[in-house]
């Protein structure tokens, strides 16, 4: 059983919040539940539609959405994906770069007032062949609603700093 700390002791009675789990402490098979959850609202959904030029009426026209099989506006999939991914940044905060995503699925709709949670499983890890001081981590993340229904999932590959190679000390992290 691994135990991760949330703060680093800097001196007598002085602690600093930590950002992410070290690459060296991650192992395939570990599952991280990301908290807190995040409730999604129609206001941000309509704004996201406008910001991203998503003109699908099902996201912001309640009268149109009422005539569909869903009966109400759907939360934009890219907003759902963004929220679910952002939830994992606290755990995987020692990331140097996102290398890619694949197998993105949106198996169930998200609606105004739904609360999203996410969890990530470590699938594999290895040292980077091209970037000394970095490791490559592959995770599978699922976004779930308040009923435990999977609404989003994807596999993501990240480049993480190894201990002693990160820029955090210089930035007072």
Sequence positions of predicted segments:
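Hydrophobic beta-sheet segments that form the core/acyl-binding groove
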Residues: 101-145
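Flexible glycine-rich active-site/ligand-binding loops centered on an Asp-His dyad
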Residues: 138-144, 149-167
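Hot-dog-fold acyl-thioester-processing enzymes
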Residues: 2-100, 152, 163-173
